[in-house]
Each structure stands twice: as structure tokens, then as C-alpha cells.
Amino acid sequence: MSIIKEFREFAMRGNVVDLAVGVIIGAAFGKIVSSLVADIIMPPLGLLIGGIDFKQFAVTLREAQGDIPAVVMHYGVFIQNVFDFLIVAFAIFMAIKLINKLNRKKEEPAAATPAPTKEEVLLTEIRDLLKEQNNRS
């Protein structure tokens, strides 16, 4: 079997294709969440706490010297990324919770006990007759 044929069979398995679709959708969803945090959530939050832009929070570790740029730790961007993560994690949690709820509804209720077979009915009748005979004696 050629390597190309093996690779094609591997790539076309349902799991690999599903994973690829999930990664692509996840990347697009990440951009939406980043925009939500950066453009919708953080500006009002910054305004509420005094007109602060979180992206500008930074600590300069070393000033710029000539052609050498400054060494800056941008912890505001980190705070924003933490918000991104929390929103993505919450959205995934809610999606999984919804999927689990839908799957539980799809589960059929326990099947009713099957009707007794002819043999079971006959044996039950024999048992009942024997009980009656023992009670008469």
C-alpha cells in the first residue's frame, strides 16, 4: 500500500475530519471572543474603574538605550487574555451542558417489560393450580 493511499485513508477517517473542523471553528470562535473582550467588555470595565485601558498596563524592566528597545512586561494584555480564556471556557462549558441535556432528552425511556411468552403463562397457571391444591389439603 502506498504512503499516499495510507495517508488519504487516515485523513478521511471521521475522527480526523471532525477534529480538523473543530480546530477551524475553534480558531474562528477565538477571534470572536477576543473581539468581544477587547472591544465590548474591557472598555466599559476600564471606564467603570476610572477610564483605564487594560492594554496599557505595563512595567518597564529596562529603559530604551539608543537603538536597543525598552524591555516591557505588558501585564494588561495578560489580564485581557485571562478574560478571553474565561469567556471561552464558560462558552464551551455551556455548549457541552446544552449538548448533554439534549442527549438525555433523546434517550428513550426504559422499554416496557416484554409480554410473557406462552411457556411463562403456562408455567404461571400450573404454579397457581398447584398452590390451590396445596391450600385445599
Swiss-Prot record:
Q: Which residues cross the membrane?
A: 10-30, 76-96
Major localization listed first in the record, in broad terms: membrane
One of the Pfam families matching this protein, by short name:
MscL
* InterPro entries recorded: Mechanosensitive_channel_CS (IPR019823), MS_channel (IPR001185), MSC/AndL (IPR037673), MscL_channel (IPR036019)
User: Does the keyword Transport feature in the UniProt annotation?
Assistant: yes
Membrane among keywords: yes
Q: Kindly list the places in or outside the cell where this protein is found, as annotated in its UniProt entry.
A: Cell inner membrane
* Gene Ontology cellular component list: plasma membrane
What UniProt keywords are attached to this protein's entry?
Answer: Cell inner membrane, Cell membrane, Ion channel, Ion transport, Membrane, Transmembrane, Transmembrane helix, Transport
GO MF terms held by the record: mechanosensitive monoatomic ion channel activity
Membrane topology per the entry is: Multi-pass membrane protein
Which range is the signal sequence, renumbered to this chain? none
Q: Which family does it belong to?
A: Belongs to the MscL family.
NCBIfam families found in the cross-reference section: mscL, PRK00567.1-1, PRK00567.1-4
Per UniProt, subunit arrangement is: Homopentamer.
Query: What's the stated role of this polypeptide?
Result: Channel that opens in response to stretch forces in the membrane lipid bilayer. May participate in the regulation of osmotic pressure changes within the cell.
- Name of the featured protein: Large-conductance mechanosensitive channel
